[in-house]
């Protein structure tokens, strides 16, 4: 048989590894997909032998490329279903409805105290990814100011994504202070 002529290796999919890879600028995965995978980790890989399409890190990255071009909202389901399967498409397009109701990111970056902090975990995952994507040297103090109002889990998520995306931002004084605070809490907890 043909399969005896090939090497077979089973790989395990890890959400943290995927997200660390996805936030890097050179991989350019859209924040909506990163947030979604964090919120629904079971959707990163869901192989069903009978399915034509199913989610994997590769198909999710391919979907990101398609969506990055800007597609009409009524086409998102069809693209997601064709690339990652029906179940993924249902969950993802539902998530997008939440994502699109996020607080105004530009307002957070300029006046973080004027924006209410959401309480829904789905929204917080989406918000952390969106903020990390927009963080730069000019707005980092405001990003951290807003981050301090988030729960610890989302503070850590935000700092991790920022530092993976741009290590230089990890040298910001506000970033360092919050990071030290989180490390102190973790070591005492």
PLM feature spans:
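C-terminal regulatory/interaction module of P-loop NTP-utilizing enzymes
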Residues: 1-189
């Amino acid at each position: 048989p043909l399969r005896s002529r090939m090497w077979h290796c089973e790989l395990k999919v890890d959400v943290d590894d995927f997200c660390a890879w996805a936030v890097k600028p050179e991989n350019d995965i859209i924040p909506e997909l990163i947030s979604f995978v964090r919120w629904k980790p079971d959707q990163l890989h869901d192989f069903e032998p009978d399915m034509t399409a199913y989610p994997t890190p590769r198909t999710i990255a391919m979907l990101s490329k398609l969506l990055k071009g800007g597609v009409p909202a009524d086409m998102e389901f069809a693209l997601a279903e064709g690339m990652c399967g029906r179940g993924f498409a249902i969950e993802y397009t539902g998530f997008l409805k939440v994502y699109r109701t996020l607080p105004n990111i530009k307002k957070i970056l300029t006046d973080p105290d004027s924006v209410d902090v959401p309480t829904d975990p789905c929204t917080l995952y989406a918000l952390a990814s969106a903020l990390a994507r927009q963080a730069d040297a000019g707005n980092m103090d405001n990003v951290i100011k807003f981050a301090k109002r988030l729960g610890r889990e989302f503070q850590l998520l935000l700092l991790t994504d920022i530092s993976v995306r741009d290590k230089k931002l990890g040298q910001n004084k506000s970033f360092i202070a919050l990071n030290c605070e989180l490390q102190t809490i973790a070591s005492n907890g």
